Amino acid sequence: MVANNDILIKFGNRVRELRKAQGLSQEAFAARCGLDRTYIGGVERGQRNIALRNVEIIAKTLNVSISELTQGISGEQQQ
């Protein structure tokens, strides 16, 4: 099992990785998501316990599925 903070940090790192791969700044990404830049920054640093609704918004904005967005963060082996 992954510690709560670890999963938030891993999720934030994944969001940052995908955002940067698309060449988006935090500000531009936040605007596309309809979320505040400081909120996105907190998510990326693992400081926000993100709501499932916002996970969906982020995934759609990044053009990935929720499972692609969360890939590799649970600490469990993918099958």
What are these regions (language model features)?
Residues 1-21:
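A short, Lys/Arg-rich alpha-helix, primarily the initiator
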Residues 2, 70-79:
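Short, charged recognition helix plus adjacent turn
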Residues 20, 31, 60:
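Alpha-helical residues within the helix-turn-helix
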Residues 23-45:
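Short alpha-helical DNA-recognition segment
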Residues 45, 64, 71:
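Short, conserved catalytic or interaction motifs in soluble domains
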Residues 47-57, 78:
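Short, basic-rich loop-to-helix N-cap that marks the start of a DNA-contacting helix
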Residues 53-68:
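DNA major-groove recognition helix of helix-turn-helix/homeodomain DNA-binding modules
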